[in-house]
Each structure stands twice: as structure tokens, then as C-alpha cells.
Curated annotation (Swiss-Prot):
This is Phosphatidylethanolamine N-methyltransferase. It comes from Podospora anserina (strain S / ATCC MYA-4624 / DSM 980 / FGSC 10383) (Pleurage anserina). Pathway: Phospholipid metabolism; phosphatidylcholine biosynthesis. The chain crosses the membrane at residues 94-114, 118-138, 202-222, 230-250, 280-300, 307-327, 385-405, 413-433, 460-480, 491-511, 569-589. PANTHER family: PHOSPHATIDYLETHANOLAMINE N-METHYLTRANSFERASE. The gene is CHO2.
């Protein structure tokens, strides 16, 4: 039920995501059978997680942090469970079948066109129930184990003797044990496994209704277009049946590989002790159940000949990718790709790749100097000449395109201009790279004038980037000139051509994004032509399936634009772009790769290997003969070209903007303004006290800007705590207080009402007692409900203690307070004294700062920003911080905010993971202040303090 993430694999033999076993917290030995790539869904992800074995072994975390050994029972897919008369049936099966029958009856009984609207609404409902509903349940289970917590709180699987809901226990026992009659007993299985089996019944209902409502919607929308010829009719049905058949094969092969464990997102509940292998459909495409696994939707759309079906299919397909990005991928990253342990020695710092480290050394000549983090791609900056030039070029092209008339002359000029820049981008830059590979021509030019290799690299990146912009913008402007807005969108295949064209453009953008994600800045700009590569090639991301994805998919957008414009000239431009791209790969990239990597290059990509394995024996023998002839012909052609002329080359790289928006919404409490059961609770019996790490003493608050009286030290009680330091809260309440009471942290200015909290806590809250909410909210509870002496108070009192740290804190300066709330609501029973969280100003603007001072000031604040976690936070200025800093941007945001307040200098968050330790960060701070010193506006060091007359005492 999840997606596959590739790992570096030079040999290309094991290119799937490496599955990291859970920490060995138990000494019980477990078998480790092989496992294949897993998929998710009846339309789900593609993680290889189940085994080709009859019995698998897994672990579920229990309350002590150890793991319980379990042996998952044999289960069956939902279709056979529902429709196979040999499989036992229970109440939930009959409910699902009844709902499906209701859908079929509605399609038959409701007259047209109302049945189409009704079924379209039904499919939309079930699709949202899948992507939003199941997605929400899986997200809270992954983050907070909330489904298991709900089951435990309801006592759903407890014996009737102690269960307040015996009817629920009996219902679940009958439901689950009926489906698995052989090797499953609900009373003996862990609660995580039982919860997963119950969750499956909900999934069965949603997925079956989703599929049936879609098919019924397609049936009621199906029609035969007017004036459709026999050829088009046969083409539609043959193509549609082929796509549906292919989709069916993808699903069956995926289920063969993953079984029910991954099909129903089993690893959100427990983990199986197995390793991943790479098999079947998962060798064909990335995320096959999200990509090629939806081919059947478009096959059904073809057979129905309905744009309504096509558009609803595209929307449903897009929602699956949203589900992948926001539900499955975060869980996979968390479960199978945890950050590596923090390195302890400076020599082991791994915050930058070997390639980037090599470039940094060449650029700076000193490995101790932090590497640049201002990448060319994905960080547009008008202060950089390359980006400013690109913006001006694009603006000029747009202006010329808009103001000039759409005549044949200007259309011709636009097409010629586009072809010229394509030739320059492919042939011109290809020639430069070819000579750079053979003789280091580009680098030698800069060395001749006393420049460095780093300067040559920087100039090349700018040249390549601007050339890429010119190539693609000129192509787009030519398409604009050749495009004619349709007068009738329903005429012929106008709408279909636009849909396919936009899809091809999206495919090229995704391909470019995947290539950049895999290669990085170094590979995107052909860094191995300028620097010796420190490692063999890796095959992850899209390269896991294709050796040269740009060869096949890199020009998809050009053909999409050709379809949209339906212009012969644009078709010619697309063909020229495709041919030049193939030439660039053959005559520039491939020879250079052979030269520097040699035998380390992979012979066949995943898709090629899969296709060859699937061929019958006679076809394999014929294919081998054809390969031999093609190889001989190719060698002859290469020798002929070498002897006849200087080989020029062509190539293409596609502009990509790597954007990822992962929105993390902290846990919230719903606001209920009125609580009816406050009677009997006296706010005077509730109390909060706060303790933390003091930043400054009270008498340090006086400066010479106050009057003379104000400068006299007072008994100031306001507490000032360190930024990011843990804060301990002690509470006192009556012994009969609600177990769902909770304490939240707020800015003093956020709430005007002292009796009721007006704003949500946004995750900054902790319950007073354990076990009342999900497990993650209990983090921070130190003690609770400890009896205390209650002199002069009616009734006994209890007390507890909690610690707010990490994400429970607000990571901005300000004046805060804690509020004690009653029974899970927002009625306030007590408010703590206000306290301030402040970052000390280490050095004022315009004054000098040494590296040692910067290091000493940064180390404690950086440790606070990294939650003082031993796996993340360094102990010394030389130690690197953990890999979590690079994965989770919140840590870098905290650090750069603190630096801005401490040193009056602003950095991008990207510098924090790039620097890797406090020493390099301090070097950057000091040198940044030195660079800004001549422009400092501070007059504080030159002007006397504000005078105060003693006569005004």
C-alpha cells in the first residue's frame, strides 16, 4: 500500500528502496524470507512488502517499547471474499453487497440524465472517502497510532467480563474469525493486528463502491458518436479493451507480489520481518499502481466515448497522486528510510554529497569553508545576474510575441528563432561539452586568464541555464504564434487533442523534476565533465526504470504542444528537438559516460530487463540476433562518421522547478465554547507554576535609557527563559478533576478572555493524565495525580508535572502563558504567570565578533533548536548534526531565526544542512558580518546614551 523509493545502486541490481529493519529490541530470532515490491490499493502504492511464503513474522510495538512477536494469518483479497461462494460470508460482506446492489438499482431505476448525475456524485463521494477519508485515518495512525488508541479506549477487543460494550466484542469476534477460520483467534492476537483486520472491512466497502460506481457512471454515459466510422469504432474498443486488460494484469501481478499485507496498508499497524526484492510490475514504472495502474480508467473512457468519463477519470487519477504524496510517501520515509545515526567525528561529516564536496573544494580551495547553497535551479534570485538575465529574456520574448501581429512573416520568424535556439542549445552546447570531455577546452580557457576551475564551472552553469531558457521560451512563443483558439470545442477531436497535449506536457515536467531530483545540481549541469566523479553512477528515482529517460520522455511536452496547436511547423520543431536530443545522448553523453565510468555502467534498465524476461524463448533468440546486427551496424556508422567529419552533438535538458509542498498540520483540539459540567469545580483550587532555564537576571533589565528611578533595581518577578529550552509546568487540581483536563501554551496577546481560550493550541498542549488522548500527546507527562497536602482547602488535591519541549514550544520570541483547561474543552481553570522567551543579542550591529565568540554563543542555541536530541544535536562545535536537519526543514528555520536575532544577520535555511556543524556556521556568521561592516547603519557604538536629568527624580 505504499510507494517505492529507490536507493543508490551502482550495479543496477538492487535499485529499490532499501528497507531498514526496526531496532532489535528483542532477542527473539526471526526468519527473514525474501519479499517483493509492494503496492497499495485497489489502486494503491507500490511498496514491495509481502512475501512469497506461507508464513510471515512481524512485530507490533507494545506499551513498554518492546515488540510482540506475531504470526499474521492467511487472508484473501476482497473480490474473492465478496464474490466467491466458497468463501465464508458475514454481516459486513452482506452490507457491502447490499450497497453495491443499491448502486446497480439506481443506475437502472433512475431515468436519464439524472442517473448520470447521481452516479457521478456517488463516485465522487466514494473517491473522496478513499483519498480523504482513508487518507486521514492512515495519517493519524502513522503519526499518532490513533486507530489503535481508539480501539484500546473503546475496549473493543477485551473480553465481555471487562468490556463495557460486549455487543461490540461479539460482533467483531464473529466478523473477524469468520473471515479467517483456520489460524486466527481474536483474543490471542495483538490489538494492532485486530485493528488492522477491522480497518480492512471499512476499506473493502469504500474500494468496492468506488470501483462499481465508476463503472456504472461510465455505462450510463456511454454512447456512439455521430458519424463515427467503423475504423474509429473498432479502434476505440480494441484500444479500450487492451488498456483495461493491461490494467487488470498490473493489478493481478501487483497482488501476486504484495499480497494483502501491503494491499491494506498493513505496515501502518505492524511490520513484517522481511527484506525487499525487485520483481514483476514494479520493474516497469515508478509507482506502478498510481501510474500505469490507472490505464484502465482511460480504456473505459475510450469505450464509453464520453468526455465526462474522461475528465472524472483524470480527476480521480490526480487524487491518487495527492494521496501518494501526503499519505504514503511520508509514512514510507518515516518507517523505512529513517535518518542515519548522527556522526560523531568531524572527518565523518556527511551533510554534503561527495560530488558537492569536490566542487566546494575546487571553488574555495579550503574544505573547512562552507559550501555554496544557492542552487541555480529552484532558487530564483533577482540579485543574481543569471536569474535577472533570464527574467529579462522571458519578458522580451513575451512582449515581442504579444505586440507583433500574427501574420505568416512573424510566424515564420518565430519558428526560425525557435529552431535556431534549439540548434544552439543542442549542437552548440554539445560541441562545448564534447571538447570539454576530450581536452578540457572550456576549463583551459579560464585557466589561461588566471581564473580557477570553480570560475569555469560557475560560468558554464550560467551559460547552460540561460541557453535552456532561450530554447524553451522560443519554442513556446512559436507555438503561441501558430495556435488558433478553437471556435467550437466539441468539433471533431479538438478537446481530445488538448487533453492529450496537456497530459504530455505534464509528463515532461514530471520527467524533468525526477531527473533533477536524482542527479542534483551537479548532474543537471553535467558536473562530471568538469570534475572527476568521486563515485560510480547511481540508478535511483526515474533512472531505476530507464537508462536515459530524456530519450523517451524528455520531448513529450514538445509533442503535446504540437497536438494542441495542430500545426505542421510545430510538428517539425518537435521532430527536430527529438532528433537533436537523441543525437546529444549518442554523441556527447554516452561516450563521456563510457570514458569515465567504463564497466560500472548498467547494461539494461529495469523496464528493459522486465520486457526481455517476459518474451517467449523464440522471440528472445530473434531479439538477440537483431541486437547483434544493430551493434555491428552502429560500430560501422560510428567509424564512418569519425573518419568523415567532426562529430557535432545535440542534446536537451528540460527546465524544471522542483517544488514540494508538504503541509504538516499539528494536532488540534476542537473548540467548544460552552461546558455544561463546570458545577462543583472551583478555579481557586487550580494552580500552575512554571520553571525553565533563566536567560538573564532581573537587575540586568535596567539600561541607561530609563529615568533615574527606573534604573534602580527592582524586585522584578517576570521570568525570561532561553529560546528553545524545555519548560517544566507543575499543576495542582482537585482530586476529582476531569481526566481529560489539559494544559496549553499561548502568547499572552492571543487571548483577550481570561475565562475562555479563543484560539486553538496548534499542537502546543499536553493532557494532565495519560491514556485519555492518543499516545503522542502523552509525551511530556512526567507525573500526574499525585496526592498533596491541602491545608485550608475543602477536599483533597492532586498535582502533576509536564515538560514542554520541541514541537510543543513556540519557536518565536514573545511573552507567553500556560492555561489549564477543563475536560477537553477551552474553559480556563487557571493561568500561569506570564514569562518571556528571548534570544540574547550576542553582538550589536557595527561591533566586532570573533569566531570563538560566535561558536560559544551558537552551540547552546543550536542544541536547543535541535531539541537537544542526542541523535541530532552536537555536543561540540566540530561535531556534525544529524541527518534529520536535512530532512526536516523546521530545524534549519529555527537556527536561522536565532542567528538573525543574535547576530543581526540573515541566512537562508539551506545554509544550515549545508554547513553541517557549528564551526562552519560560526565562520559564515563572522565573515558575513565582516562583509556587512562597511555598510552598517548602527550608530550605537559612536553615540552617547540618552541623557537623563537628575532633577526629574
Amino acid at each position: 500500500m505504499s510507494t517505492t523509493t529507490a536507493i543508490d545502486d551502482p550495479a543496477g541490481l538492487k535499485t529499490t528502496r532499501q528497507r531498514n529493519n526496526q531496532p532489535q529490541q528483542s532477542e527473539i530470532p526471526l526468519p527473514s524470507p525474501s519479499i517483493s515490491d509492494v503496492d497499495s490499493d485497489s489502486n494503491k502504492g507500490d511498496d514491495h512488502r509481502d512475501a512469497h511464503v506461507k508464513k510471515a513474522y512481524g512485530r507490533t510495538p507494545d506499551g513498554t517499547g518492546m515488540h510482540t512477536l506475531l504470526s499474521p494469518s492467511q487472508t484473501h483479497d476482497m473480490v474473492s471474499q465478496l464474490l466467491d461462494p466458497r468463501e465464508p460470508k458475514n454481516l459486513s460482506d452482506y452490507i457491502v453487497l447490499g450497497v453495491l446492489a443499491l448502486h446497480i438499482w439506481l443506475a437502472w431505476a433512475v431515468p436519464a440524465p439524472y442517473n448520470k448525475y447521481l452516479l457521478g456524485f456517488a463516485f465522487t463521494f466514494w473517491r473522496l472517502a478513499y483519498n480523504a477519508g482513508i487518507g486521514y485515518l492512515l495519517t493519524v495512525q502513522s503519526k499518532y497510532t490513533l486507530l489503535v488508541t481508539w480501539a484500546r479506549r473503546l475496549r473493543a477487543f477485551e473480553q465481555p467480563a471487562t468490556n463495557p460494550r460486549p455487543w461490540l466484542y461479539n460482533l467483531l469476534k464473529t466478523e473477524l474469525e469468520t473471515k479467517i477460520p483456520k489460524d486466527y483467534k481474536m483474543d490471542e492476537a495483538p490489538i494492532e493486528y485486530n485493528t488492522w483486520l477491522a480497518f480492512r472491512r471499512i476499506v473493502d466497502l469504500i474500494l468496492m463502491c468506488d470501483f462499481v460506481s465508476y463503472c456504472l457512471f461510465a455505462i450510463v454515459c456511454a454512447h456512439t458518436p455521430e458519424d463515427e466510422g467503423l475504423g474509429m469504432l473498432l479502434g476505440r474498443w480494441v484500444g479500450g479493451i487492451a488498456l483495461v486488460g493491461f490494467n487488470l494484469w498490473v493489478k493481478l501481478d501487483a497482488h501476486r507480489v504484495v499480497k494483502d499485507y501491503a494491499w491494506y496498508w498493513g505496515d501502518f499497524f505492524y511490520l513484517i520481518e522481511q527484506e525487499l526484492t525487485f520483481d514483476g510490475v514494479f520493474e516497469m514504472a515508478p509507482h506502478p499502481m498510481y501510474s500505469i495502474g490507472y490505464a484502465g480508467y482511460y480504456g473505459i473512457s475510450m469505450m464509453a466515448a464520453s468526455y465526462d468519463v474522461l475528465f472524472i477519470s483524470i480527476a480521480a487519477h490526480a487524487l491518487q497522486f495527492v494521496f501518494l504524496a501526503f499519505v504514503e510517501n511520508p509514512h514510507i520515509e518515516k518507517t523505512y528510510n529513517p535518518p542515519p545515526p548522527r556522526l560523531r567525528a568531524e572527518s565523518e561529516i556527511g551533510s554534503q554529497t561527495e560530488a558537492d564536496a569536490l566542487v566546494t573544494k575546487e571553488l574555495n580551495g579550503n574544505s573547512d569553508i562552507p559550501q555554496p547553497v544557492h542552487n541555480m535551479i529552484g532558487s530564483f534570485d533577482l540579485f543574481r545576474v543569471t536569474d535577472a538575465s533570464s527574467l529579462i529574456i522571458v519578458a522580451c520574448f513575451i512582449a515581442l510575441t504579444v505586440v507583433t501581429p500574427t501574420t505568416r512573416t512573424y510566424q515564420t520568424l518565430a519558428v526560425v528563432n525557435a529552431i535556431f535556439w534549439r540548434l544552439w542549445y543542442s549542437v552548440g552546447l554539445g560541441y562545448i561539452l564534447k571538447k570539454q570531455s576530450e581536452k578540457k577546452m572550456y576549463t583551459r580557457h579560464f585557466l589561461k586568464f588566471g581564473e580557477s576551475t570553480g570560475e569555469a564551472w560557475r560560468q558554464w552553469k550560467g551559460l547552460y541555464h540561460i541557453s535552456m531558457i532561450l530554447c524553451h521560451v522560443s519554442f513556446l512563443t512559436a507555438c503561441w504564434k501558430m495556435y488558433t483558439y478553437p471556435e467550437d470545442w466539441s468539433y471533431g477531436s479538438v478537446l481530445l487533442k488538448h487533453v492529450i497535449g496537456v497530459s504530455l506536457i505534464a509528463l515532461q515536467l514530471w520527467t524533468s523534476s525526477s531527473i533533477y531530483e536524482s542527479l542534483g545540481e551537479f548532474g543537471w549541469f553535467y558536473g562530471d565533465f568538469f570534475f572527476e566523479s568521486p563515485r560510480p553512477p547511481t540508478y535511483n528515482s526515474i533512472y531505476r526504470f530507464l537508462n536515459n529517460p530524456e530519450r523517451v520522455l524528455g520531448a513529450a511536452g514538445f509533442w503535446g504542444l504540437a497536438l494542441i496547436t495542430w500545426s505542421k511547423a510545430v510538428f517539425v520543431m518537435a521532430l527536430v528537438s527529438q532528433l537533436l536530443m537523441l543525437g546529444f545522448i549518442s554523441f556527447v553523453e554516452k561516450p563521456h559516460m563510457q570514458k569515465i565510468y567504463g564497466q560500472n555502467l548498467r547494461k539494461e534498465a529495469g523496464l528493459t530487463k522486465f520486457v526481455k524476461k517476459s518474451l517467449p524463448a523464440p522471440v528472445k533468440r530473434w531479439q538477440q540476433g537483431v541486437d547483434k546486427v544493430l551493434d555491428e551496424t552502429k560500430h560501422f556508422a560510428e567509424d564512418f562518421i569519425d573518419a568523415a567529419l567532426t562529430r557535432l552533438s545535440a542534446g536537451s535538458s528540460n527546465f524544471v522547478k522542483d517544488t514540494t509542498a508538504l503541509f504538516h498540520k499539528p494536532l488540534r483540539l476542537s473548540i467548544n465554547r460552552i461546558d455544561r459540567d463546570l458545577a462543583g469545580y472551583d478555579p481557586k483550587h487550580y494552580k500552575l507554576s512554571v520553571e525553565g532555564e533563566q536567560l538573564i537576571a532581573p537587575d540586568e533589565k535596567a539600561t541607561r535609557k530609563e529615568s533615574a528611578d527606573a534604573r534602580v533595581p527592582k524586585d522584578v518577578k517576570t521570568k525570561v527563559f532561553q529560546y528553545g529550552a524545555p519548560i517544566r509546568v507543575k499543576w495542582t487540581a482537585p482530586a476529582n478533576h476531569s481526566k481529560k483536563d489539559w494544559v496549553g501554551l499561548y502568547l499572552v496577546t492571543d487571548n483577550r478572555n481570561r475565562d475562555f481560550t479563543e484560539v486553538p493550541s496548534l499542537g502546543r498542549w499536553i493532557p494532565t493524565c495519560r491514556g485519555q488522548y492518543d499516545t503522542t500527546t502523552d509525551e511530556g507527562i512526567v507525573s500526574y495525580d499525585e496526592k498533596v497536602k491541602s491545608e485550608g482547602v475543602e477536599g483533597p488535591l492532586v498535582q502533576g508535572e509536564m515538560v514542554f519541549e520541541g514541537d510543543k514550544l513556540w519557536w518565536t520570541q514573545g511573552v507567553y502563558e500556560f492555561r489549564y483547561h477543563h475536560h477537553g474543552k477551552h474553559n480556563v481553570m487557571s493561568i500561569s504567570e506570564p514569562f518571556e522567551v528571548r534570544i540574547p543579542l550576542v553582538v550589536k550591529e557595527g561591533t566586532e565578533l570573533t569566531i570563538e565568540e560566535a561558536e560559544n554563543a551558537l552551540l547552546p542555541i543550536v542544541r536547543n533548536c535541535l531539541d537537544r536530541d542526542p541523535e541530532i544535536a552536537p555536543e561540540t562545535v566540530d561535531e556534525p548534526w544529524g541527518a534529520h536537519v536535512e530532512r526536516d526543514g523546521k530545524y534549519a528555520e529555527r537556527v536561522v531565526y536565532a542567528i538573525r536575532e543574535m547576530f543581526a544577520i540573515e541566512f537562508s535555511p539551506a545554509v544550515v544542512p549545508a554547513d553541517g556543524n557549528v564551526k562552519k556556521l560560526a565562520w559564515r556568521v563572522v565573515n558575513g558580518r565582516i562583509a556587512l561592516a562597511p555598510y552598517s547603519m548602527s550608530l550605537q557604538s559612536r553615540r552617547p546614551p540618552t541623557p537623563v536629568a537628575d532633577s526629574y527624580k
